[in-house]
């Protein structure tokens, strides 16, 4: 009986360790990318869309227009699959920085299999700076502030307007905490 109990306990620890290896984030519908989709260890992971300043706003430079980003937490090596939503030439994909702990494999259907060895940040660039995918493979969060603390201004998953008139005011000793999946519209003004 001791042997069976010990085996069951070890199996439970191994299973929970396996489940905790990756935490995927969601992205609200209005921010989802039209360029890319991603999975991490088989789980759907949100991909958000963003823009750089591009013509006609700044006619002197072309900064590349729309890009996308995806983020997740990992505490063990992870397999990330990314796929462009529209047909794209994926034959010259670069991972930058080149020193990122990522192994790239291009699949016949145009999907990319990225073996990420440890938490890091990198970009997937099929054709230079045009419509890249930024990947934020974060370590698990530590020292999370208590959202019930009156000195903590916390925003949970979803879309939020930051404070009055879109401005978040922070005073001396206050902490701003954005949980995974929080999208806050507005600016931050810190005093103290």
Model-derived features: positions:
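Extracellular/periplasmic carbohydrate-active domains that bind, remodel
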Residues: 19-192
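Hydrophobic h-region of N-terminal signal peptides that target proteins for export
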Residues: 5-19
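Small/flexible residues
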Residues: 4-5, 191
């Amino acid at each position: 009986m001791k042997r069976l109990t010990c085996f069951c306990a070890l199996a439970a620890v191994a299973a929970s360790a396996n489940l905790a290896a990756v935490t995927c984030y969601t992205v609200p519908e209005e921010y989802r990318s039209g360029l890319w989709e991603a999975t991490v260890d088989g789980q759907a992971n949100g991909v958000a869309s963003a823009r750089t300043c591009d013509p006609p706003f700044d006619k002197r430079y072309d900064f590349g227009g729309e890009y996308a980003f995806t983020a997740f937490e990992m505490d063990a090596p992870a397999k990330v699959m990314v796929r462009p939503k529209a047909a794209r030439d994926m034959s010259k994909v670069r991972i930058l920085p080149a020193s990122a702990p990522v192994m790239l494999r291009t699949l016949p259907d145009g999907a990319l299999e990225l073996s990420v060895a440890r938490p890091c940040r990198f970009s997937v660039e099929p054709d230079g700076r045009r419509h890249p995918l930024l990947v934020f493979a974060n370590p698990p969060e530590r020292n999370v502030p208590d959202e019930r603390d009156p000195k903590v201004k916390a925003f949970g998953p979803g879309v939020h307007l930051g404070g009055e008139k879109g401005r978040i005011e922070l005073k001396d000793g206050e902490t701003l905490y954005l949980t995974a999946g929080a999208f806050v519209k507005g600016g931050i003004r810190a005093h103290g």
